A protein has these predicted regions:
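N-terminal maturation segment of proteins
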Residues: 24-612
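Sec/Tat signal peptide C-region and signal peptidase I cleavage site
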Residues: 19-23
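Bacterial N-terminal signal peptides that target proteins for export
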Residues: 1-8
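Bacterial N-terminal signal peptides
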Residues: 9-17
Length: 612
């Protein structure tokens, strides 16, 4: 008996030592802290359960969480797998609901909200029965194969083994698609067909790697056989999706109001009503067109409207544009006006040492922005690589943060390199890498954009780092471009024009996202809105609509995230006046992580209180 009394006394003393603040107050308050510790531990256990579910049922995503054992597998897309995964997630959802959120430590309440929403979203995805309705569900397997080309995940031989295994598993994915899909949306089938085509064309890169790195002739012959089979499966899936895309009467590809609002709330933490979403989209579009009008002004001054300025030192006179009076009755510009001016500009771009030069320019930008007190000093190096062909068919560049618990975590930025003959290479370089486009890319994706942001957030806790809200992450990319403009990195008239157009494109894409999935736009309505009302080229309009279809809510998250950051920045600038330090503000924001936008204000307030 005395032994137990002594043990309890020691426990009490140790707890009091850990929480000295309570010793002078309520002695029973210590048990509140114990409750908080227990709830925090329960949250960590729930997070571990979620990762275990990913590893068991969704190996493609487990790879992105850093689980090397998942790299040789693709998801099994069958009703039995979905039912088992659903039961596991529902059990976890119940456990999360039973937690006492009010007892969490303040730092964990946000993590709780992130994990809870994540599980809700996973369950919603399974309940949509994408097995039978969504061809894009199967093309995620292509992403999983090519994801292995983006990171050095393990020993080279083991990584090639994983690449070979996933390539071989594409046959099973093709079989599952044919067995499960029942009259899916023709438009979704078209998008799947395009991805299958890109995967087929790009597979030569996988085939070449596996064959050239084979250890002996026998292994090389085996690699040739397996890669030929994989290419055949990709071609067969392309033909199958093509046939599905030609069906006449198919289900609607739009989410509809209920599901769209669910996605916004549980993936992006955007909680506005449908009417508020539509009004905000209209407001942003109007503001973007006004800003584009202002950015176009330097390019719309004719020779007759330029004034000759005689310099005092006797050097040659220069022409300076007169300040034009804005015609208030003139219609606001559209994308067509931007295209007209862009075609007049003598844009150029070098194709020499592209990767090295971008990395060097990023470091120069980091030094410049640090000197201007826009960001904290940052010494790279910036890891810039060639974008694998599969992704290059769909985008000009791609930033990839570390894969979760990756053994040797790396931040990687991939750039599409120009291909084809000399003329084609030059044309692609001018499109993707002209000086102004290059600056926007560096500012938004490298520094102070996603790359810089990811490195600064390496110390964040597991839940917040792995399951952060896309809204602030995407908004930061826009905020980074405007920060670079404010600091004088994006400075020329052409730079400002390109940024104004990019903002306009984002506003138009968000408007399509909202109106498409709320049922206000059909595909034809969206095309008319983009091409006729807003002057976008048909190819660009198609990209916007396809992106909104494949990733509902993503386009909207950019302006919402940016406005959240911009509003808080303005608040602290006004509050602190001359004491405001932009680099310090940005560092505090990044130190918080990608939390729900509505919680950022309070979290930032606490960050200022705790780090004075």
């Amino acid at each position: 008996m005395n032994k137990w009394k002594t043990l309890l006394a020691l426990v009490a003393v140790s707890l009091l030592a850990a929480y000295p603040a309570h010793s002078a107050g309520d002695p029973f308050a210590i048990f509140d802290d114990i409750d908080a510790m227990m709830e925090d531990n329960a949250l960590m256990e729930a997070s571990n359960r979620y990762e275990s579910i990913m590893l068991t049922f969704f190996p493609e995503r487990a790879t992105l969480l850093g689980f090397e054992s998942a790299n040789t597998q693709l998801d099994t897309r069958t009703p039995a797998r979905d039912q088992a995964a659903l039961l596991a997630l529902q059990s976890l959802q119940t456990a999360i609901k039973e937690m006492h959120g009010e007892k969490f430590s303040p730092a964990k309440r946000t993590d709780y909200a992130l994990l809870k929403a994540r599980v809700n979203y996973e369950i919603w995805q399974l309940n949509r029965n994408r097995l039978t309705t969504d061809p894009l569900y199967y093309t995620q397997a292509y992403d999983a194969v090519y994801d292995l080309l983006l990171k050095r995940l393990s020993l080279q031989a083991r990584q090639n083994e994983a690449l070979s295994a996933r390539s071989a598993a594409l046959a099973q994915t093709a079989t599952e698609a044919r067995q499960n899909l029942k009259a899916p949306s023709a438009f979704l089938a078209q998008l799947a067909m395009e991805k299958a085509y890109y995967a087929y064309l790009a597979y030569e890169q996988v085939s070449h790697r596996l064959q050239t790195q084979a250890q002996d002739d026998l292994s090389r012959q085996d690699a040739v056989k397996k890669t030929n089979i994989a290419r055949k499966n990709l071609k067969n899936m392309f033909e199958y999706f093509k046939a599905l895309s030609q069906q006449e009467e198919t289900p609607d590809f739009r989410l509809g109001e209920k599901d769209y609002l669910f996605v916004l709330q549980n993936k992006y933490f955007i909680t506005d009503s449908p009417s508020a979403l539509r009004k905000a989209a209209q407001r942003r579009l109007l503001e973007a067109r006004k800003n584009l009008q202002e950015a176009l002004e330097p390019f719309t001054v004719s020779a007759d409207e330029e004034a000759e300025i005689i310099t005092e030192d006797g050097s040659a006179p220069v022409k300076k544009a007169k300040k034009k009076k804005r015609n208030k009755k003139a219609p606001l510009p559209t994308a067509a006006d931007f295209y007209t001016i862009k075609n007049r500009l003598a844009l150029d771009a070098s194709t020499n040492n592209i990767l090295f030069s971008i990395a060097q320019e990023a470091q120069n930008a980091a030094d410049f922005l640090a000197d201007r007190n826009a960001v904290k000093a940052f010494k790279g190096p910036f890891n810039v690589q060639a974008l694998p062909a599969y992704f290059a068919y769909m985008q000009a560049y791609k930033f990839v943060p570390p894969y979760g618990a990756q053994n040797l975590p790396t931040d990687d930025f991939f750039v599409r390199l120009p291909t084809g003959n000399a003329l084609a290479k030059h044309k692609m370089a001018v499109q993707d890498l002209n000086p102004s486009a290059r600056k926007l890319m560096i500012a938004g994706e490298l520094v102070p954009g996603r790359y810089y942001k990811s490195v600064q957030q390496n110390a964040l806790g597991g839940i917040r780092k792995r399951y952060g809200v896309p809204t602030l992450n995407n908004g930061w990319s826009v905020y980074a471009q405007h920060t670079a403009q404010e600091a004088g990195y994006i400075i020329t008239d052409t730079d400002n024009l390109f940024l104004a157009f990019e903002d306009y494109r984002r506003a138009a894409a968000a408007a399509v996202d909202v109106n498409l999935h709320l049922g206000q736009f059909s595909y034809a309505d969206a095309m008319t809105f983009l091409t006729q009302a807003n002057g976008f080229e048909k190819e660009e309009a198609e990209k916007i609509i396809k992106s909104a279809t494949a990733l509902p809510g993503e386009a909207l998250s950019y302006p919402v995230g940016y406005e959240t950051l911009k509003t808080l920045r303005q608040k602290y600038q006004k509050k602190q006046g001359a004491r405001f330090n932009a680099a310090d503000f940005n560092a505090r924001v990044l130190g918080i992580g990608d939390i729900p936008p509505a919680q950022l204000s309070k979290a930032l307030e606490d960050a200022y209180k705790n780090k004075k």
